[in-house]
């Protein structure tokens, strides 16, 4: 476990005279442009694990403040199979398994992945513009727009901050100060009615239909793209207008060869304004101090694990 990296460090402490301007440009394009970017060629095959973690942490200084990714306060997450999907529960976070991850966003302004090892087969990364999905549904099924902007209960997947309920309300479509922020998390909507039937109403037929229409629209080849990312590739995504997924994968047999990614959840200080109801999940809406699973905003008290761990205390 690494805890020595400074939470007060700035770009001046990690100078990158050539790469730094490119990192800033990619982040700007993610925040106010196309919403995603890919950087290729980091020499992770010859770096040690600690070197990879330090380099990736250095990238974060150019992109935003790190946020806790689970109740163990991981600031750099390890996306790797640590739970056999045949034994996984409905509340297990899918990034810990080899099962396909449906279209979703992460609980941060920006999310980044650094690819250390790829799977034997599968594990494709998919991206789609949630703004394009919205426009297409508005064109073809305008009756579903009020449904998507209505009340949606989401499960916390057993990561419940003190004083909070195991579920919360967050609309899919959120208009605020000139921005349309779209929060989409398939599989998180279906759980609360099943787990808390006395508190959470079942999904309506209109909501069920809206989920299916969203899935079908996002998966259209003229709307989504799929990429086979290689070791040393870094992706950066804006969660407010890009949804992403991952196909199921078959992993290598040897433990040293298994699919392994590092992940950052980031909150830039110049991020867009968000409505107050995001606070229930994000712990606040102040840019630079929001996001994560709601236990604490900001990097203070966080840790940098060297290897994948089960991030949920209760699986």
Q: Language model features by range: what are they?
A:
Residues 1-19, 24-25, 32, 37, ...:
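Active-site environment of non-heme Fe oxygenases that use a 2-His-1-carboxylate facial triad
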């Amino acid at each position: 476990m690494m805890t020595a990296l400074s939470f007060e460090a700035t770009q001046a402490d990690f100078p990158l005279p050539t790469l730094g301007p490119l990192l800033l440009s990619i982040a700007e394009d993610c925040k106010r442009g196309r919403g995603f970017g890919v950087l290729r060629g980091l020499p992770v095959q010859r770096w040690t694990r600690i070197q990879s973690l330090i380099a990736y942490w250095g990238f974060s200084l150019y992109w935003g403040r790190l946020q806790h990714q689970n109740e163990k306060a991981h600031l750099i997450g390890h996306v790797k199979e640590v739970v056999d999907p045949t034994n996984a529960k409905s509340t297990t976070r899918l990034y810990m398994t080899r099962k396909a991850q449906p279209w979703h966003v992460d609980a941060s302004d920006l999310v980044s992945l650094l690819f250390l090892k790829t799977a034997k087969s599968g594990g494709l990364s998919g991206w789609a513009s949630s703004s394009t999905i919205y426009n297409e549904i508005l064109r073809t099924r305008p009756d579903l727009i009020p449904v998507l902007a209505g009340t949606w209960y989401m499960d916390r997947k057993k990561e419940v901050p003190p004083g909070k309920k195991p579920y919360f309300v967050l609309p899919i479509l959120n208009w605020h100060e000139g921005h349309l922020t779209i929060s989409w998390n398939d599989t998180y909507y279906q759980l609360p009615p099943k787990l808390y039937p006395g508190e959470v109403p079942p999904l309506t037929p209109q909501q069920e239909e809206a989920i299916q229409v969203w899935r079908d629209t996002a998966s259209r080849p003229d709307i989504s793209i799929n990429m086979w990312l290689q070791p040393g590739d870094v992706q950066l995504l804006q969660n407010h207008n890009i949804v992403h997924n991952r196909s199921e994968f078959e992993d290598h047999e040897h433990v040293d060869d298994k699919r392994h990614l590092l992940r950052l959840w980031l909150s830039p200080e110049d991020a867009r304004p968000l409505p107050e109801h995001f606070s229930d999940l994000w712990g606040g809406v102040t840019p630079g101090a929001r996001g994560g699973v709601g236990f604490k905003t900001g990097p203070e008290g966080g840790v940098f694990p060297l290897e994948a761990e089960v991030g949920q205390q209760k699986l």
